[in-house]
Structure formats: structure tokens, C-alpha cells
Amino acid sequence: MAVKNIVAVDLGASSGRVMLATLHTATQHLTLKEIHRFSNTLVFQDNHHQWDLAALERDILTGLHQIDAMGIVPDSIGIDSWGVDYVLLDQDGQRVGLPYSYRDHRTDGVMATVTAELGREAIYQRTGIQFLPFNTLYQLKALCDAPSDDLHQVAHLLMIPDYFHYRLTGSLVCEYTNASTTQLLSLEKKTWDSELLDYLGVPRRWLSDPVQPGHAVGKWAAPSGRQISVTAVATHDTASAVVGAPLQSRDSAYLSSGTWSLMGIESDTPFNSPQALAANITNEGGVDGTYRVLKNIMGLWLLQRVCQERDIKDLGALIEAAAALPAFASLINPNDDRFINPPSMHQAIRDYCREHGQPVPHSDAELARCIFDSLALLYRQVVLELGELRHAPIRQLHIVGGGSQNAFLNQLCADVCQIPVLAGPVEASTLGNIGCQLMALGAVADLAAFRHMLTHNFPLHRYTPRAESDFAGHWRRFQALSQPETAPKGKKETTQ
């Protein structure tokens, strides 16, 4: 029986993993085995939030070396990660400058400057990408406006997965789905926008032409001497997660739920109308020529930070306690900039509630309940926005990723959005990474065939919406909070 062994390196903003997938091609039976899981934490050094790229590389190699020591010869290796962040290299392939994180505060206020100079409408028409203060466009504006001798040394700019491609193979490539998150890619031409680069002062030579998922990057020399193929997958983890979401129709929306919540639809055409701009909808690159028409939501980052700050170890007990509390007592707008990276998340939540005349959540369970209720309401808002944009309602929400394990939040989403919710698979980005490799190898015919295979190999859990009494009043409260003009004066900017 023919077998394909595939390695997926899946790097998230808080953790990473090296996974081994085995596909028995005759039966289409797919299994996953976790080889190595590791944390990915921000490092605050030289007054900036940075990624520890050396630690990530060590962990990637730890997983790959373990597979090699097992005597397994992978047919391919693929890497995906979060978007917008980049690495600069000199002519010799050595890193230049700091590996900044998108949560670093050096971009505070930069987006306002750029949009004032270029115009939001003009930028959106060119790129179709939502306005987030940490987009690569604004990171590079901050970099180039504070010039140093380092800039003269730069020869290459690589997104995070492409940097690790380079470290494994020595090949310099730029994969399309991650490049699309930069807000520097032409929506129409799917290549770099020269006018935006000129505005920044970024030389075109820094950037390779984007390649599509499935591109053969090169070979990794394993300790055993084996030469293992490295394939460019949909290297933006959300793009891979969408591949790994077994959507049942074009009337289904996906929600990749983790540190970030990314909700959207799969579309053959982008949406960059004034209505889409007003909703801050993004059109990121997908596989097979599709667009990921979606919206970024702050996601479980809020809960992760609260748990970290308050040393909460038993997440299950916290969720159970939160579920027992009255619903919608205290609400926040999770996408308020103050929640991007405050010194204290629980204090930022309390301050927000106090400023908006709401009960202040004090206990751990009250904080968690506030986060869950607010996220569910924001999910409803985006579901409605997507339906209006496509002139057809969203009829089902498919939740994938780590957050899909939260049964309480899944049911809350179904109740608040008033549509059925399907949850799973948990490792959607890993599976999408694997799917891209299997399609490149010809082991799976196409995206539809891969998703069909997923439904037969990984269980899905269905949540049916229940009627919520007095919901209309809570919804009006949240809608008022989500309007920018309701933010107290001087409180919109990210907390320093």
C-alpha cells in the first residue's frame, strides 16, 4: 500500500509544533502524530518586543531531527506561521536589525500618518487589505523613517516562513498568501505595488516575486544525509487553516479561532467596495486563486493574557465558572486598539468597562465571561457584515483551530449568531499545511477532495442555536460599543 509521509511545521504567535502526517493513499486514511510542541513567547529586549528566531529554529530542527532519527523519510516538509512580520538579511544571508513582533509599539500612530498622506480609499483600492496598525506597510514605514546604517546592509526581506525556508534550504522565496498580509501587494496583479514601495523608500530588490502554494522551495539536508523536499504551502497560518476547514458550501463562513480569531468566506473574487472598506474587510490570498475575504478579531489573546497575568492553570474550571454567571453583564469591544498589547490585560478590560458605565468584572470568572460574551457578539457582527457584503446570508459557521475545543464558546456563538456551528478539526492550520503538500505531490486531486477526506478522518461537532431571551437589548449595547465614536476621548490608542 502506497504511503505518503508529510511534515508540517506550524508556527503560531504563542506556540509551535512539528507534526508528522501519514496518508495511506489507497484508503485515504490520514493520521497525525505530534513530534515536537514548543512555546513561542515574545522577548522584550532593546526596548522592543521581538521574536526569538534562534529558539524557533532550534525547535524546528529538534522536531525534524527526531523524525530523521526514527528512520522516516518524509516526502515533503512545509512551514506556516502568522502574517505581517518579516526578517531582513544582508547579501551574505545574515540577519540585519531586530526581528520585531507585530505587537511592538514602534508602529503606534504610524497608520494614521500613512493614511493621512496616501488616503485610506487609495490604499484599500490598491491592496484590498484591512487597516491594522501593525501591518507590514506601517512596520516598514516606522523602520524607514528611523534610518540607520543597518538599512544600507539590507539585501532581502523575507516573511517569517520564508526565513525558515531559507534556513533549511538556502533558497530565497516569497510565498503569496503570507505576502498578501503585508498591505503591499497589488490586489489586481498579485505582485508588489511599486508605488507603495517607493513611498516607503523600500528598494524593489529586497523582495522576490511571490510564488504560489505548492512551489518547490529546495532540499533540506537531514543529519542522516537524506535530501528532503521543502514545499511552499499556504504559509500564512490562516490560509492553511482555511484549507483545513471542511467547508460544506459557499454559504458557510469559517472562523479560525486561536490567539487571533479570523472570520471570513472563501471567494473567487475580492471585495474592495466602499462597503467592504467601511467594515474593514480584508482580501488575503488563498489557494487555487481564491481570496480569503475576512476580518481579524482580537480572539483568545485576551483570555491568554488574563490567564498569564493571574496565573490561571485550570482553563476548564475557569470556563465552567464563567458559564455559570449571568450572560452579557459586562461587554467590551475586543477589537479596541487598547487590547493589542496592554501592560495589564485584566486592568485594561476593567478600565474599559468602568469608562463605559458598566459593571466592572473583578473575579477571574467574570473577566472570562466578559471576554466570551464580547467575542460572540463580535462574531455575530462580522457574520452579518459578510452576509451584507455578498448579498446572501451566512447559513453556517465552521470553527477550526484550538478555540474550537471550547464547547461553551461554540454554543454561545451558535446562540448569538443564530446559525448552526460546526467545530473542528483542532489542528486545521497543520492539516491545511499538509493538504497543500499532498496536492503538490499529486496524492490528492484538489481542494475539494482534500476537504472530503478530512470529514472522514476527523470528527466534527455540531452546535444548534437556541433562542436567547432579551437578546435584542444586549445586541444594541454591543453595537453602541463597537462604534468608534463611542470610545472615550483619548482612550482609543494602544496603552503604552
From Swiss-Prot:
This is Rhamnulokinase. GO terms for biological process: glycerol metabolic process; rhamnose catabolic process. The keyword ATP-binding applies. CDD domains: ASKHA_NBD_FGGY_RhaB-like. Keywords: ATP-binding, Disulfide bond, Kinase, Magnesium, Nucleotide-binding, Rhamnose metabolism, Transferase. Its EC number is 2.7.1.5. The lineage of its organism: Bacteria, Pseudomonadati, Pseudomonadota, Gammaproteobacteria, Enterobacterales. It is an enzyme of class 2 (transferase). Involved in the catabolism of L-rhamnose (6-deoxy-L-mannose). Catalyzes the transfer of the gamma-phosphate group from ATP to the 1-hydroxyl group of L-rhamnulose to yield L-rhamnulose 1-phosphate. Disulfide bonds join C353-C370, C413-C417. It catalyses: L-rhamnulose + ATP = L-rhamnulose 1-phosphate + ADP + H(+). Pathway: Carbohydrate degradation; L-rhamnose degradation; glycerone phosphate from L-rhamnose: step 2/3. The active site is at D237. The keyword Magnesium applies. Belongs to the rhamnulokinase family.
